[in-house]
């Protein structure tokens, strides 16, 4: 049995302790039902299961009137730690699936327009949309100041031009938070984050020549 004495630490409140107990009881039977022979399919199944059980509501904020789908007014780091530690102990991919829902939609949670928040965050919380965080590039890696991907304003949207790589959930995500250069400011300034959906014209998701690095590229209106 895991040591759960940490639940008595003073910086956890009754909500966190109840969360830990309920999640522990859920993990065993729910995660045992996931077939891991196909990693992408397993990840999709885990997102659905986590969403249906309500755990993904801790990955996004509630928003005004609860309209963004979250369980709490703000994302609670203590709740996230409890969820990730418990999920990882039972199934590492379950922890990954939860974490990527939060990371992939994080830019929208923190700085997105009301329209983007209302469009994307509720389905993320329900496990009906898979999110991806598209920052790294073949030449720049994760050096934001050296990003080459560009987003050019076009009417009421943007045209994206560039390539991303090492994208977790690449190929299975329903939308991508793509870090792209929209201004002439040097370095990390002038960076914006359009959020194109899967299947749009010009958006290509696949793997590298070795078959194992998810990539995202092409020109895409977002």
What are these regions (language model features)?
Residues 16, 83, 113, 133, ...:
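Buried hydrophobic positions in well-ordered alpha/beta secondary-structure cores of metabolic enzymes
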Residues 157, 161-206:
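A short core secondary-structure module
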Residues 1-19, 151:
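Intrinsic disorder at enzyme termini
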Residues 143-161:
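Cytochrome P450 C-terminal beta-domain/meander region
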Residues 127-135:
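A short, Trp-centered hydrophobic/proline-enriched beta-strand micro-motif
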Residues 97, 139-142, 166-169, 182-185, ...:
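Short Gly/Pro-enriched turn/cap motifs at secondary-structure boundaries
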Residues 146, 201-222:
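Flexible, small-/acidic-enriched active-site or ligand-binding loops
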Residues 53-118, 122-128, 169-175:
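Internal helix-loop-helix
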């Amino acid at each position: 049995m895991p040591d759960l004495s940490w639940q008595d630490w003073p910086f956890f409140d009754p909500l966190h302790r109840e969360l830990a107990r309920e999640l522990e009881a859920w993990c065993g039977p729910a995660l045992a039902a996931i077939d891991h022979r196909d990693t992408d399919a397993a990840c999709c199944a885990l997102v659905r299961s986590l969403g249906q059980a309500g755990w993904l509501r801790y990955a996004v904020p509630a928003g005004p009137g609860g309209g963004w789908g979250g369980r709490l007014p703000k994302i609670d780091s203590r709740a996230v730690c409890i969820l990730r530690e418990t999920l990882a102990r039972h199934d590492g991919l379950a922890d990954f699936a939860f974490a990527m829902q939060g990371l992939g939609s994080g830019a929208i949670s923190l700085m997105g327009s009301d329209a983007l928040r209302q469009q994307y965050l509720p389905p993320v919380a329900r496990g009906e949309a898979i999110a991806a965080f598209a920052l790294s590039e073949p030449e720049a890696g994760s050096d934001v100041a050296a990003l080459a991907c560009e987003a050019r304003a076009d009417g009421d949207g943007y045209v994206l031009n560039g390539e991303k790589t090492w994208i977790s959930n690449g190929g299975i995500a329903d939308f991508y938070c793509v870090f792209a250069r929209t201004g002439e400011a040097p370095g990390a300034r002038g960076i914006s984050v359009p959020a194109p959906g899967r299947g749009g014209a010009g958006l290509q998701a696949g793997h590298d020549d070795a078959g194992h690095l998810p990539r995202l590229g092409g020109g895409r209106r977002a």
